[in-house]
Amino acid sequence: MRHLQRLYDDLVAASQNKPGLLGKLFGKKDQAPVRGLYFWGGVGRGKTYLVDTFFEALPFKEKTRTHFHRFMKRVHEEMKTLGGEKNPLTIIARRFSDESRVICFDEFFVSDITDAMILGTLMEELFKNGVTLVATSNIVPDGLYKDGLQRARFLPAIALIKQNTEIVNVDSGVDYRLRHLEQAELFHFPLDEAAQESLRKSSRALTPESTAGVETD
């Protein structure tokens, strides 16, 4: 939790030093982003829970919480609308930075060559615009897109992640989903609404890292 507390404090401090109206008008928005966090480790280690709790606690509205692949789907959709632009990723990154100071990605995982080829430029532009990245992943940054086609072109994205986030391994040897089952009520009678809610609660606890959608607040 100390990593999240550090980031929270840094973001709050940075919010008190945001550029004023003149700075925005004259394009002085570019600033070094607050260094984010990249949580990686096995399934069931509580990564998503930590980030969800952190996201809800942030005391400002310019924030986004989304599954990584949903985010990339939006990027590709916006690129289609900017087909005539010379630097579409610069424009897209500016749009994201206008919406959010912090972007929280769940399940950061790269398998698509198209995503791999554009992520370096996209991340460079996001960080240039002061966006802070918080991500969860099952894979350490150096293992992303391993053995992928033209992986050398993806390496700048890995370097940017390592430069702009604190890498935190959350493997503790404890699967918190299984711990929940050990404490859960396994026999339900009668089969009423309370029993149904108990089952729903156990289901949510078992699959927290696959239930997140897009949240902007």
Where would I find each of the regions flagged by the language model?
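Walker A (P-loop) phosphate-binding loop of P-loop NTPases
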Residues: 44
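Hydrophobic positions on the alpha1 helix immediately C-terminal to the Walker A/P-loop
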Residues: 50, 54, 67
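Short glycine-rich substrate-engagement loop in P-loop NTPases that contacts/grips substrate
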Residues: 63-100
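Phosphate-binding P-loop
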Residues: 7-20, 24-34
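Hydrophobic anchor at the beta1->P-loop junction of P-loop NTPases
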Residues: 39
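Post-Walker A helix-loop "phosphate-sensing" segment adjacent to the P-loop in P-loop NTPases
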Residues: 55-64
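Conserved lysine of the Walker
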Residues: 47
